[in-house]
């Protein structure tokens, strides 16, 4: 999966070769949608690669991708740079995603409040015994600064406080899963679609511990799980005729069924 994501997934849109780049959160979904789309339009080809939301938007600015995948909204300066280059960026929400907090399976801690998560990732809480766990050093994993997931977690969970100095930054979501699964004191955060049996997802409370909610598609859809965000595609308006068939497919009933099947929340 990680190697495939790194080198790109060559699949094929109607009659066009297309490049899609950016968010690792969007990557598994876009790969699957592209495979399904190619099956319907074998004359087309789409190349899908990850790297992070910032990487995708930078590629859109430089004209090296047709669609930028992002797990956050485009920033003012990113939009301004596109406009400076004579490009008019357009935005579409293709799905929603929940962020799960993941722990090593051996960790006796099963639930954390937002305030505890803030303390852990800002460095104020350094040992699991401080949140009801064993006397074990906390090893916190994060995404890199170019990641939209990094920025969304900072905004939603840390309330825009800075991550602690020396936090272990991973280049891709899969690397967080792998690292947490191999480190008893570890904690990290990943998109819901990346959850597997190698890690344990913590229940999360945003009301001071009165109610803890398990990260799941059902809880994300009914809005009882608090860490949910939209997933975006950005493209240049002048390129709309080229990218619209693929985007329309993702927003169709068939495409949205794939959204749900792949572990994301449909837009409707």
Report each predicted region and the residues it spans.
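Bacterial N-terminal signal peptides
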Residues: 1-12
């Amino acid at each position: 999966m990680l190697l495939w994501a790194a080198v790109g997934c060559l699949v094929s849109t109607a009659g066009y070769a297309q490049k899609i780049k950016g968010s690792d959160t969007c990557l598994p979904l876009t790969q699957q949608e592209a495979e399904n789309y190619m099956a319907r339009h074998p004359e087309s080809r789409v190349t899908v690669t990850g790297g992070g939301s910032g990487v995708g938007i930078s590629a859109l600015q430089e004209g090296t991708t047709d669609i930028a995948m992002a797990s956050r909204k485009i920033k003012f300066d990113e939009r301004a740079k596109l406009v400076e280059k004579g490009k008019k960026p357009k935005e579409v929400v293709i799905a929603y995603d929940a962020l799960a907090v993941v722990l090593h399976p051996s960790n006796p801690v099963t639930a954390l409040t937002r305030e505890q998560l803030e303390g852990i990732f800002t460095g104020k809480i350094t040992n699991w015994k401080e949140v009801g766990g064993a006397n074990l050093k906390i090893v916190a994993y994060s995404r890199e600064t170019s990641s939209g997931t990094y920025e969304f977690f900072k905004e939603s969970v840390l309330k825009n406080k800075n991550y602690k100095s020396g936090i272990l930054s991973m280049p891709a979501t899969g690397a967080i899963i792998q690292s947490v699964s191999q480190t008893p004191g570890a904690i990290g955060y990943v998109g819901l679609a990346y959850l597997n049996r190698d890690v344990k997802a913590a229940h999360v409370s945003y009301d001071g511990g009165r109610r803890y909610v398990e990260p799941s598609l059902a809880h994300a859809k009914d809005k009882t799980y608090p860490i949910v965000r939209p997933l975006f595609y950005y493209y240049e308006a002048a390129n709309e005729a080229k990218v619209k068939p693929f985007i329309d497919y993702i927003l169709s009933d068939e495409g949205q069924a794939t959204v749900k099947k792949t572990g994301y929340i449909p837009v409707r």
